């Protein structure tokens, strides 16, 4: 019979040849590990059909290339607003370069790593498959139902990668934040340069449940292994000019432990930017504020100076003056309602990195680009700054001195009438009337705005 004849034909490929990867099949089916494995299994059982599978793979690749190329003009001619256009283009940007990047991103390439059921928060909030491609490396997210790539970023355009604990959660989790070039909230791109959006996803503590190598082999699920360690390792292996940054106690740790997980150190500080609540992290490469859009990352070389305002008994504000790379214009960012318990740790961090003095900003920028300039004067200034009392400590000491004077002059019959002078009268009355909690909290938390409110209206 013909069937018997086919199956009795001698194999034309050795076992060694079959066990190796076939480039055409890798290119065509790299994004479909399960299907790719079935193809290799079929080749192993019937190696005489390897040329047929290669032809199918070539045809599949050509179809996908044609489909990718056919959508390029559509990405360019949208007349939508810029923000909407970026969203339509899945976070890759706009213009001809953006369309080409989109086509490259969506082209099915062989995978080096993928993890299913990953909870993304930016730029979309949904569960997707996290992928890292081999060769021309992209980090991208794929819809698990439609199998379409939703968004992504070339790894060689990533500026910062952060792995940060998620605050105020009973279960331990980590947020991975991918900040591409020009997406840090400080630096704007040159005209015509596409800007990928920041990408953020959350990983639970413990072994990975659905992580695989590019060959479809499950990894990271053994005892003692964690998904956080696995993702961090994979990213570090594929990043060319940066590494994953994590918070550490040597840089900064909050004076208050993690409230929802007893005994665990907290690395964040709660703060407000306007009405938006978020968390500040003081890291080895800069200061991060998240986790709501837009994320902000202040690299050391972009910080001109940091100062304190509205220093009260329980809270203070942090002001960061930042400058985009290559720009003379500065931007000021105020973070308010920071707990006084953390002022000492924050001040130590700021002094350690010389962020309190605008005259050291050029030295920080030079260090970023490895420029060896004359350091004697700047180092001398830095040393004197280290020896001097910090601005926050000075304000704190003056406030305590005023409170001591108020206690010495206190007259119980005066009911807290104006015993001090100038702008310190409200702060002194806060201390004398500490039992009146509601009134105190309003005065303290209004910060500098309280100075313009009559005392009888607080």
Curated annotation (Swiss-Prot):
Q: Does the keyword Transcription regulation apply?
A: yes
* UniProt GO molecular function: DNA binding; histone binding; nucleosome binding
**What disulfide bonds does the UniProt entry report for this chain?**
none
Which residue windows are transmembrane per the record? none
> Where does the record place Acidic residues bias?
400-418, 427-438, 446-458
| A GO cellular component entry from the record | nucleus
Superkingdom of the source species: Eukaryota
The record's subcellular location field reads: Nucleus; Chromosome
Q: Which InterPro entries match?
A: PH-like_dom_sf, RTT106/SPT16-like_middle_dom, RTT106/SSRP1_HistChap/FACT
Where does the UniProt entry say this protein principally localizes? nucleus
Q: Which UniProt keywords apply?
A: Chaperone, Chromosome, DNA-binding, Nucleus, Transcription, Transcription regulation
Q: Where is this region: Disordered?
A: 371-458
Subunit text: Interacts with histones H3 and H4.
Enumerate the PANTHER family for this protein.
Answer: FACT COMPLEX SUBUNIT SSRP1, HISTONE CHAPERONE RTT106
State the family it belongs to.
Belongs to the RTT106 family.
Known role: Histones H3 and H4 chaperone involved in the nucleosome formation and heterochromatin silencing. Required for the deposition of H3K56ac-carrying H3-H4 complex onto newly-replicated DNA. Plays a role in the transcriptional regulation of the cell-cycle dependent histone genes by creating a repressive structure at the core histone gene promoter.
Name recorded for this polypeptide: Histone chaperone rtt106
Source organism (scientific name): Emericella nidulans (strain FGSC A4 / ATCC 38163 / CBS 112.46 / NRRL 194 / M139) (Aspergillus nidulans)
